[in-house]
């Protein structure tokens, strides 16, 4: 399935299936796409979508490790949280949108949970995107399902909705025996806790196996971190997954129609 410019609120500017970003190379020829199962979220952030329909300000905290902080990106503006904020603002013209980047490289789930009070709860977000699992896989540690489950419950108790993001599909991750266990644990945790799951692993595997996009189009030379194209595509897919089927508030809908007419 192509990157869903056909969601109800996509503007003409996002009708292209290709995400264009610096540097302008052969990467620009690769299409940003993903299978339906990677984008369905399973448990959508319904209250977040209600805020959109009501025209209320939106705040998201993206917490995670180096692929949240943006290792491999050419600038802070090219990280996935920054690109996500830009995507949401473009698709929701007139709505105040803030995406806070709370990624710290090298962390595993326990270290992230320990930061929740300062980095998540004090921000009072409407939605939390929790990218987790990659460093456990890299260090041959079992992905701690119980710690993640407890963390999700704390996030929910704070009033935020939650979307989990599993490991990236990258050579250094694929070389480790624990990757499937990590993907399975995070999937099961999201399902059991009734929170969203953005299946980054499946989306990136689709790029490689179905779209036949070489790793160097979306992964840096370290074999682990995404480049600007990879982060931009993930941001677009996450935005479309969050917004799919969302009813726009009248002011935003009018602005979007105006953008299409132009």
Where is each model-derived feature located?
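Extracytoplasmic small-molecule ligand-binding "clamshell" domains
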Residues: 69, 79, 97-100
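Alpha-helical cap/lid subdomain in secreted, periplasmic
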Residues: 82-98, 107-261
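Hydrophobic residues in alpha-helical segments
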Residues: 52-53, 103, 208
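Active-site metal-binding loops of divalent metal-dependent hydrolases
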Residues: 65-66, 104, 134
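Short gly/ser-rich anion-binding loops that grip negatively charged ligand groups
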Residues: 70-74, 102, 106, 110
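N-terminal secretory targeting modules
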Residues: 1-63, 68-74, 89-95, 122-123, ...
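Short glycine-enriched, charge-decorated loop/helix-capping segments at active-site entrances
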Residues: 74-75, 220
